[in-house]
């Protein structure tokens, strides 16, 4: 539940060169054409994987991201690290958190120091019940990007699940203060959790 609450990250493919391709091509078709022109180019494979990810074609996305990693064993331009991060995102979307954790850790090991990696790793760890470790990664996401408001919600969920009610309340309040006032399902869910925790504290 906690992992699913945070797994609404929007992933976008990097812009590419349209060249002489028809204007009505989908992003997948455009990226597929690029791979046909350069099948051993890891960047083309990465971008095709991202296009498949956007289209929610997860099996195809995984295949292309794995191929991007294989084609770039030296992690030139940090492409293998990026591919591992996005592979982890695909695995997390498929509820394969244990494998996602491995992919996110590999992205970090390869030097992809981005708040999104730490946030996603925190989400995967939370879904596996590894709350103390998740808390470390959510905090790192906030250190790298203080505007990563989802990390406050993640911290709240991890603290709540580990029985640290006061800390959970603080993080939920920070989250709600940081996000725009909307009727978003995630915001409503956090408001409800916060209200229940405050009620529980009064008992």
Predicted regions, residues:
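Terminal, low-structured helical/coil segments at or just beyond the last alpha-helical repeat
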Residues: 22-25, 161, 167-203
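Helix-start (N-cap) detector for alpha-helical repeat units in TPR-like alpha-solenoids
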Residues: 42-43, 76-77, 81-82, 115-116, ...
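Canonical tetratricopeptide repeat
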Residues: 47, 79-82, 86, 120, ...
């Amino acid at each position: 539940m906690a992992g699913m609450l945070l797994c609404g990250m929007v992933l976008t493919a990097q812009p590419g060169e349209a060249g002489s391709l028809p204007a009505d091509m989908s992003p997948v078709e455009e990226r597929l054409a690029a791979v046909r022109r350069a099948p051993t180019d890891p960047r083309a494979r990465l971008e095709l994987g991202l296009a498949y990810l956007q289209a929610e074609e997860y099996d195809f996305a995984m295949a292309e991201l794995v191929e991007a990693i294989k084609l770039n064993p030296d992690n030139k331009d940090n492409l293998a690290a990026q591919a591992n991060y996005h592979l982890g995102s695909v695995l997390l979307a498929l509820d394969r958190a244990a494998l996602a954790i491995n992919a996110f850790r590999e992205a970090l090991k390869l030097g992809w120091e981005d708040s999104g990696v730490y946030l996603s790793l925190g989400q995967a760890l939370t879904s596996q019940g590894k709350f103390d470790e998740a808390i470390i990664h959510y905090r790192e996401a906030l250190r790298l990007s203080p505007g990563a408001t989802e990390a406050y919600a993640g911290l709240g969920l991890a603290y709540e699940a580990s029985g640290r009610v006061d800390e959970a309340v603080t993080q939920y309040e920070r989250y709600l203060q940081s996000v725009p006032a909307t009727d978003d399902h995630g915001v409503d869910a956090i408001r409800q959790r916060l209200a229940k925790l405050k009620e529980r504290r009064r008992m």
